[in-house]
């Protein structure tokens, strides 16, 4: 669920880091359209696409098991859609960490008018 996703992000990037990714670029936060602005925004685009492929439960609400082992996110013994959601969140949190140097403060709270290009397909 989104709370667990936030904990994954904070675990990879430090306490309260999740706030950097709420309303960032064209895809981080609720909804999304246009072309991702940078590698960080692309992490959110890929995460949105991943959630869109999940069947059988609500990715934003379903609770799955996971843990941190030596700084790595490890999805637990989830089945079906819970496993899929955990993997979506794990990959995105790792993506934010791998691309933290692309983070651009100018894309925080970006106006939706800057995201009007034709949206990419997943």
Curated annotation (Swiss-Prot):
| Record protein name field | Basic phospholipase A2 vipoxin B chain
CDD domains on file: PLA2c
Q: Which reaction does it catalyse?
A: a 1,2-diacyl-sn-glycero-3-phosphocholine + H2O = a 1-acyl-sn-glycero-3-phosphocholine + a fatty acid + H(+)
Active site at: 47, 89
Q: Which organism is it from?
A: Vipera ammodytes meridionalis
Q: What does this protein do?
A: Heterodimer: postsynaptic neurotoxin.
The UniProt entry, under PROSITE patterns, shows: PA2_ASP (PS00119), PA2_HIS (PS00118)
Task: Return the Pfam families for the record.
Answer: Phospholip_A2_1 (PF00068)
So where does Ca(2+) get bound?
27, 29, 31, 48
């Amino acid at each position: 669920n989104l709370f667990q996703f936030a904990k994954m992000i904070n675990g990879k990037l430090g306490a309260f880091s999740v706030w950097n990714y709420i309303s960032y670029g064209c895809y981080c936060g609720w909804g999304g359209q246009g072309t991702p602005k940078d590698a960080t925004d692309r992490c959110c685009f890929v995460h949105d696409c991943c959630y869109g492929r999940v069947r059988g439960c609500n990715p934003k609400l379903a609770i799955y098991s996971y843990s941190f082992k030596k700084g790595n996110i490890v999805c637990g013994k989830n089945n079906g859609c819970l496993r899929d959601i955990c993997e979506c969140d794990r990959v995105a949190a790792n993506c934010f960490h791998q691309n933290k140097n692309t983070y651009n403060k100018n894309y925080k709270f970006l106006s939706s008018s800057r995201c009007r290009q034709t949206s990419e397909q997943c």
